[in-house]
Swiss-Prot record:
Protein name, UniProt field: Putative pterin-4-alpha-carbinolamine dehydratase
Signal peptide: none
GO molecular function: 4-alpha-hydroxytetrahydrobiopterin dehydratase activity
Primary enzyme class: lyase
Annotated family: Belongs to the pterin-4-alpha-carbinolamine dehydratase family.
Listed EC numbers: 4.2.1.96
Gene3D superfamilies reported for this sequence: Transcriptional coactivator/pterin dehydratase (3.30.1360.20)
Catalytic activity: (4aS,6R)-4a-hydroxy-L-erythro-5,6,7,8-tetrahydrobiopterin = (6R)-L-erythro-6,7-dihydrobiopterin + H2O
A Pfam family hit: Pterin_4a
Family matches, as HAMAP family: Pterin_4_alpha (MF_00434)
Species this protein is from: Shewanella pealeana (strain ATCC 700345 / ANG-SQ1)
Keywords of this entry: Lyase
Any Gene Ontology biological process: tetrahydrobiopterin biosynthetic process
Length: 112
């Protein structure tokens, strides 16, 4: 996870390649708490983070917003009492790019 979390996102254009099945297997192994979901034919990374209350969940959400702005890559975020569901995918390519794994690792680091 640390290796990915230290990487920088690269600009992802509409013609950027999605991760291959081999890359997916290698990258997902580095972020074992994340799952792969498919919604509307679009592969996405998703993880639920647990908190003791809503205030802590909201604080994490706000820190994640700052992280996303700094890296110019933005997740889906659902903040509820005691949990935050984070979903990463690359909108421009309608699927997964290495950036999504980088940001998932950075999100894990933020949570620690």
């Amino acid at each position: 996870m640390t290796e990915l979390a230290q990487m920088k996102c690269e600009a992802c254009q509409a013609d950027a390649p999605k991760v291959t099945d081999e890359e997916l297997a290698q990258l997902i192994a580095k972020i074992p708490d994340w799952g792969v979901e498919v919604r509307g034919g679009v592969m996405q990374l998703e993880r639920v983070y647990k908190f003791k209350n809503f205030k802590l969940a909201m604080e994490f959400t706000n820190k994640l917003a700052d992280l996303a702005e700094a890296d110019f890559h933005h997740p889906g975020i659902l903040t509820e009492w005691g949990k935050v569901t984070v979903t990463w995918w690359s909108h421009s390519i309608k699927g997964l790019h290495k950036n999504d794994f980088i940001m998932a690792a950075k999100t894990d680091t933020l949570f620690q």
